[in-house]
Design a protein with these regions (language model features):
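Metal-dependent amide/peptide-bond hydrolase catalytic core
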Residues: 42-47, 54, 60-257
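Acidic/histidine-rich catalytic neighborhood of metal-dependent amide-processing enzymes
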Residues: 1-55
Length: 257
C-alpha cells in the first residue's frame, strides 16, 4: 500500500544546514511525493503519551551593533554613548505587545539573550555596544513582518541620536501548524491504547526539523520524554523506549490499512 523512509540526521541543532534541510531540497528536485511525516522529537514533558506537537513557533535571532563615539566620561558632549542608545532600543523592543496568542499558539515573545559592551575602563565612554535577542513567534507573524517592525524602531531611535546601527538577522524557522485530521486522531488513539493517556495537541517548545519537512508534506511530532534533554546524564526509560517502538509500529500498521 505504500513505502516508508527513515531519515536520521546528525545536524539538527543550531543552524542545521547539512541535515534534513538538504534532504528536503533533494526530494523537491526529485519531485518525490510524500504523504506524511512523523518526527521523533522528545515531545513529552514528564510521561510518555502526554503530548503530540502539531506545529511550532518561528524563531528569529537578531544581533544588533550600535556605533557611538568614544570619549572621556567627564566630557560626554565630546562623545556619543552607544550604551544609552542600545538600552533605549532594547526597552522599546521589550515593550512591544506583539499579540495575545491564538487558539493554537502562545503569545509571541522577545527575549534579550546577550548584552556586550567591551570596555575595560570605568571612565571611558565606549565606541560600540552590542546585543543579541530572539523572538519566538506564532503564525500571526512572519520573520519578514517582524524584521520590518524592528527596523522601524531602530531607524527612528538611531535618527534621533544621530548614530549608526547594524543588525544581522538569522531565521531558524517560520511558525507552522498542521491542522488536526484523521491521521492526527488515529495517532492519538494509538498512543492512548498503549500508554493509557490521551495526548494533548500542542505547539509549545523550540524549533524542530519539521520546519523543513513541512515544505513537502504535513507532519506531526511524537517521541520520548524530554525531561533530561541537553542535561548532564541525559537518559530515557527503557520501558518508554519499548512502548514507543510499539506506538510507531501500530501507527504504521494503521496508516497503511
Amino acid at each position: 500500500n505504500g513505502s516508508i523512509s527513515l531519515l536520521i540526521t546528525g545536524d539538527e541543532e543550531g543552524d542545521a544546514v547539512n541535515g534534513t534541510k538538504k534532504v528536503v531540497d533533494y526530494l523537491k528536485k526529485k519531485r518525490e511525493n510524500i504523504n506524511f511525516c512523523l518526527v521523533g522529537e522528545p515531545t513529552n514533558p514528564n510521561r510518555l503519551g502526554e503530548m503530540i506537537k502539531i506545529g511550532r513557533r518561528g524563531s528569529l535571532t537578531g544581533k544588533l551593533t550600535i556605533h557611538g563615539l568614544q570619549g572621556h566620561v567627564a566630557y560626554p558632549h565630546r562623545a556619543k554613548n552607544p550604551s544609552t542608545i542600545i538600552v533605549e532600543i532594547l526597552k522599546k523592543f521589550k515593550d512591544i505587545k506583539f499579540d495575545k496568542g491564538t487558539k493554537d499558539f502562545q503569545p509571541t515573545n522577545l527575549e534579550i539573550t546577550k548584552i556586550n559592551i567591551d570596555n575595560t575602563a570605568d571612565n571611558v565612554i565606549p565606541a560600540i555596544a552590542q546585543a543579541t535577542f530572539n523572538i519566538r513567534f506564532n503564525n500571526k507573524h512572519s520573520s519578514t513582518s517582524l524584521k520590518k517592525r524592528l527596523n522601524k524602531i531602530l531607524k527612528r531611535i538611531s535618527k534621533k541620536h544621530k548614530s549608526k546601527f547594524k543588525v544581522e538577522y538569522r531565521v531558524s524557522g517560520e511558525a507552522f501548524l498542521t491542522k488536526p485530521d484523521k491521521t492526527t486522531f488515529m495517532i492519538q488513539s494509538v498512543i492512548k491504547k498503549i500508554t493509557k493517556i490521551r495526548p494533548k495537541l500542542s505547539t509549545t517548545g523550540g524549533t524542530s526539523d519539521l520546519r523543513f519537512i513541512k515544505a513537502i508534506c504535513p507532519g506531526l511530532e511524537f517521541g520520548l520524554v524530554g525531561k533530561t534533554m541537553h542535561k548532564v546524564d541525559e537518559a530515557v526509560s527503557l520501558k518508554d523506549l519499548k512502548n514507543l517502538t510499539k506506538i510507531y509500529l501500530n501507527i504504521i500498521q494503521n496508516y497503511f490499512k
